[in-house]
């Protein structure tokens, strides 16, 4: 157990702390004020004294006779620019002794009550660093100055800075009217900063600091009181927690006692239930024994052993009342016997399940065989249908072939007759030419009129002869093409013998391109003959390929067993 401090001990510790150590000033509070005799320069006064240091490097220029100029100065220390009223580029007018006035661009910075100006190149440095250089081009103090806006000869937006102590007024020009107004407001507000205002501000700051110190001390005292009260409340809370813990422990012990009593009661009830279960198990075993005796003769020997065990169990049941451990042992023996019987029943069930699975397999095989027979019947019907279609088509092709052969014979006879006529016409033309040449000078005029017509007739007959020769050669070309197509089909069908029927049908459709004769009866004889010759070879070969593939498949069906036979995909 941890030792607890009483409120009296806490008060004694606090008093000893107060006596031993003086009160420290607050960390976040304002700094302590110095005695009234010593005057410290802070805030605006310090910045003014810094700005009146020897930055201009001139001894005789007394711009202001305020006490800030008589101080020690802080020229060596130059911190960051904490506040700048305005800055920017303005035009400054300057005039030397015997020369005309000129305007020059300068970078001006308004810091508190001083207007500092640099060269224009310093603008980038100032915007980056935000620090004032210790060596400017010039400094203009604005305390007590009068600032007026107006215009000059060349410039309109001008500002005039005048002071009785300055030798001449300073003129500055802005780029537009807006910047002029902005600079005018900033400069006039800067002229209001003076020594009196700074002194008043310092006194107000000191008063506020003193008030802050008093408030911090009061705050400390209140915090100490609150800490003491909080500690007292914490102690009371700790005591209450301890009491609650003790109460919880007592309740836990009470619950434990209740649980133990419940467990004992449950154990007694379980013992009673176990005894009842043993009696019930005995009855069930007797019933099972009677049923097994009636069912099978093989189990009679086992039932006799069970009867012997039953007598033993009766003896053991009498001992159970005296000893609980013996009852458990007897229960285990009975459970083992029951397990053996259950195992035998499970063996019978497993054998029955095996028979059922074999029966299902046989049924599935029968179904598979029936499906295969149906598929084969469909394939046979499909092949018969295809063969009948091909036979019909072959009949049509044979009729077309007979027609083409008769037409070819007629053409050959017509060609021979045309050749004979051409020969007779050529002989007649030769006789005419000879007769015309044999005539004398009297027939010159007739020759001039007749000879061109004779030449034209001769050219016409020569063209007809060439066309007849070309048609005679065309029949030989067609025969050669038919033989070549037959050889290609022989090779292709030899490769397609082992493939399925779908591949064979696609090949026939792609290569035959068979069109029935009835669809296009008005076609010319030449194209009809060419298509008929092409059809004949493809259809003959397709019929042979279908017969050979059908024979191979029927042979494979008869030779191979039906379980390993792959079904044809129609």
From Swiss-Prot:
Family the entry assigns: Belongs to the PLEKHD1 family.
InterPro entries associated with the record: PH-like_dom_sf (IPR011993), PH_domain (IPR001849)
Basic and acidic residues composition-biased segments: 1-13, 561-570
Disulphide bond pairs: none
Pfam entry (one): PH
Keywords from the UniProt entry: Coiled coil
Signal peptide: none
PROSITE patterns with a match to the protein in the record: PH_DOMAIN
Protein name (Swiss-Prot/TrEMBL): Pleckstrin homology domain-containing family D member 1
Coiled coil residues, start to end: 202-448
Every PH domain range: 83-192
Biased composition (Basic residues): 542-551
CDD domains: PH_PLEKHD1
Compositional bias (Pro residues): 23-34
Superkingdom field: Eukaryota
Region annotation Disordered: where it falls in the sequence: 1-42, 542-570
